Amino acid sequence: MKLKYFGTDGVRGIANETLTPELAFQLGRAGGYVLTKHAKDDEQPRVLVSRDTRISGQLLKHALISGLLSVGIEVMDMGIVTTPGVAYLVRKQEADAGVMITASHNPVQDNGIKFFGSDGYKLSDELEAEIEVLLDADKDNLPRPSSTGLGSVTDYPEGGLNYTAFLEQTIPDDLEGLHIAIDAANGATSSYVSQIFADLNTEFDTMATNPDGLNINAGVGSTHPEGLAKFVVEKGADMGVAFDGDGDRCIAVDELGNIVDGDKIMYICGKFLSERGRLKDDTVVTTVMSNLGLYKALEANDMHSVKTQVGDRYVVEEMLKDGYNLGGEQSGHIVFLDHNTTGDGMLTAIQLMYVVKQTGKKLSELAADVTTYPQKLVNVRVQDKKLALENQAIKDIIEKVENEMNGEGRVLVRPSGTEDLLRIMAEAPTKEAVGQYVDRIVAVVQSEVGVD
């Protein structure tokens, strides 16, 4: 289902250019109406609203809230809380919906609006389509109460504190004895990390915890973990964790300064849970972009995997369908469904630290089971991406390469979700091998269906 406004993670755009306050107002009206129309008749619906630290968040928040109020919704303004914090608090407060204003790991000029249902899950494609119909309607026929039916705003600053208290009780013991380094990306976790990791009795050092509205994700956080890697070594920490702007991702760094990505975090936590009989069906849910090294490590330890398309919402859908409790993405969106309904960076960090403490092993030792295979990705512009995948010559070269790999590599050819591109990716034991495999497939794609 191709939507006009909603992408894989809400509505995104350049703040005040494509994501305007006018659009935020309309999203408040349309989204608020769709998500609360089934609220009990005897009470006004309630919606939680939060944002990350980017400067445009204030502009968009006020516009969005105005839209919500105009259709008679009571708004609880939480200030700055993480995306997974909103997902948790919607359920705790028994609210009708939650809205997070963020562009996650994107640069400061971008922003977005992300909705959660009363169950704490991101919206289905069908609900998003219903909102879009109202956004594009010739006439706005939604309710416009003029007095008694209008909504009002209540500040809910304790929301963030309730969320951090929840995080701290997701492990049965504290983390005393661990020395950790934390990169908060100058984002939504900045004002919470010191309190949480002090309460858990860690020794900790922090970086990128001083947001100024403009420095969110700027060379720091989960998409730029190199700075944290140096910081860990410099401080002599046992490990480091980096979050992104809205706190739904976590990338770790071991005591030697090596990056421990989402694949390795899933493996480490999955193995720990599996050994204790707490990993449902001994299965981890991943996306097609997870590295072959993860699958080999899972297999070697009698664990299974299920693959979905790219996007943490699809991981969650698969987990719900079959009752799995651990899944995620290489990028650091890790979902612990026993605790929260979406990827949660601080929750992931706490679970990973707990494994390190309980096993008594260094993070580098725990991550060593996963050998990351060299990967190469090339985008090729084509006339028709759907027809390209049905081309016999392309099918033949993919099959030939896969046969040559003989289980020691993999090929993934998939269409771009937004452009007429084929994404050609391969993994193999050496850089030379993976380069040669990809180049051969690219040559056939270009000669058969490529566009100069």
Swiss-Prot record:
One of its GO terms (biological process) is UDP-N-acetylglucosamine biosynthetic process. Activated by phosphorylation. PROSITE patterns: PGM_PMM. Keywords: Isomerase, Magnesium, Metal-binding, Phosphoprotein. InterPro entries: A-D-PHexomutase_a/b/a-I, A-D-PHexomutase_a/b/a-I/II/III, A-D-PHexomutase_a/b/a-II, A-D-PHexomutase_a/b/a-III, A-D-PHexomutase_C, A-D-PHexomutase_C_sf, A-D-PHexomutase_CS, Alpha-D-phosphohexomutase_SF. It holds the Pfam family PGM_PMM_II. The keyword Isomerase applies. PANTHER family: PHOSPHOGLUCOMUTASE (ALPHA-D-GLUCOSE-1,6-BISPHOSPHATE-DEPENDENT), PHOSPHOHEXOSE MUTASE. Catalyzes the conversion of glucosamine-6-phosphate to glucosamine-1-phosphate. This is Phosphoglucosamine mutase.
